[in-house]
Curated annotation (Swiss-Prot):
Lineage: Bacteria, Pseudomonadati, Pseudomonadota, Gammaproteobacteria, Enterobacterales
Name of the molecule in the record: Membrane-bound lytic murein transglycosylase F
Active-site feature positions: E314
Homology family: In the N-terminal section; belongs to the bacterial solute-binding protein 3 family.
Main location: membrane
Membrane topology: Peripheral membrane protein
SMART domains per record: PBPb
EC primary class: lyase
Subcellular compartments: Cell outer membrane
GO biological process: cell wall macromolecule catabolic process; cell wall organization; peptidoglycan catabolic process
Gene Ontology CC, one term: cell outer membrane
Amino acid sequence: MKKLKINYLFIGILALLLAVALWPSIPWFGKADNRIAAIQARGELRVSTIHTPLTYNEINGKPFGLDYELAKQFADYLGVKLKVTVRQNISQLFDDLDNGNADLLAAGLVYNSERVKNYQPGPTYYSVSQQLVYKVGQYRPRTLGNLTAEQLTVAPGHVVVNDLQTLKETKFPELSWKVDDKKGSAELMEDVIEGKLDYTIADSVAISLFQRVHPELAVALDITDEQPVTWFRPLDGDNTLSAALLDFFNEMNEDGTLARIEEKYLGHGDDFDYVDTRTFLRAVDTVLPQLKPLFEKYAEEIDWRLLAAIAYQESHWDAQATSPTGVRGMMMLTKNTAQSLGITDRTDAEQSIRGGVRYLQDMMSKVPESVPENERIWFALAAYNMGYAHMLDARALTAKTKGNPDSWADVKQRLPLLSQKPYYSKLTYGYARGHEAYAYVENIRKYQISLVGYLQEKEKQATEATMQLAQDYPAVSPTELGKEKFPFLSFLSQSSSNYLTHSPSLLFSRKGSEEKQN
């Protein structure tokens, strides 16, 4: 995966061509009869997307996601509200453009020659490859040549259909597949791990995120090379919306916003460790329930799930953990640090968590105010691991090497240099295991992503089970209850033991469409 890197050569050429073609209408906000004017008159930017961990998601009713955040900032740039419509699959997205129900599609869509025949692309902002996936333990195909429609299913509107057709015509004449008109790629990947489907195809970023929650999903082979991802708008003679998008993305690049968004959503790395992820998720089921109340109790300024991820990275949630260097306990505190925090027993889980939070808060308070709010925690965690003085050195080294010392993306690239003599010999505080601090923060981010996604999945399953129970045992009137034998006691037994003990706070509906006003 190539991360959020805007293709500025492409933008520059396109901007020049647009400037020549549109010079009578520039500035784009100066005309009354154009798409931008219509959007501003309406007071809202209508964006259609799909529900994925990367593009658009919700936690506790609050929307987030790479495409959502970019779309929200673009709406702010235009001075209008953002209206998001969530569709079930890609075909429905393009229907919105065809029917005039959307101004833009922001859903991690791949640029290809077929799509640009009918729709206008925007700037490309990262790239993906299309990959065939299967379930660990099942047969792994090494080629597409013998796959049949009974084995391979893809989502409607998926860009890979064009690639499959080309491969069938040129290389694999026996290749066949089917399209499921009712399911998106995420749902098809779920079918694969549940054993309902042998294979499906999804993009490399979606697969990487899915594996954080479902490590049993594996990549069999690449179907395509890297393909650029972009937004799409209607193809017509009015290019004012394209001009506005170019202005917007250029401004985002110049002020560093794009780099921060890259780090936020794609900066956790794309390497996947099956064994480590599976071990972590087992611990979520078996160990976390006993510790969750403590994490929730002491997580004040950070999400309790992030605190849990920190503790897992430190000790794998083992209150008795001890390292050769003398650090001990759930949060692996040194003896001196524990004493300074008033901790009398480092192996007591509650004391250790309380002390770890206080120490992390101390690191957070030292991070300069010039660091963006949503990146301060990563600076603090690196300082938690290697000491704040070495974090100062890392920032100084970043500035000396023409990076931004307030950007975590820039600083983390320099952390490994703190253990290399040509660099640490010239720094104030000398040698540090910067490579370990780098890995420390990256691992915590991966555990946090897995934990959030896994808990969401569990709550979704509980919700679906409750809904199924309601369908199996519909409400009946007292009169009907007297007339017919009804398994009421069975209903109470199942409800109290399984379903009513779960009170889901995160609901993820994938039926039809949903509209959100922001």
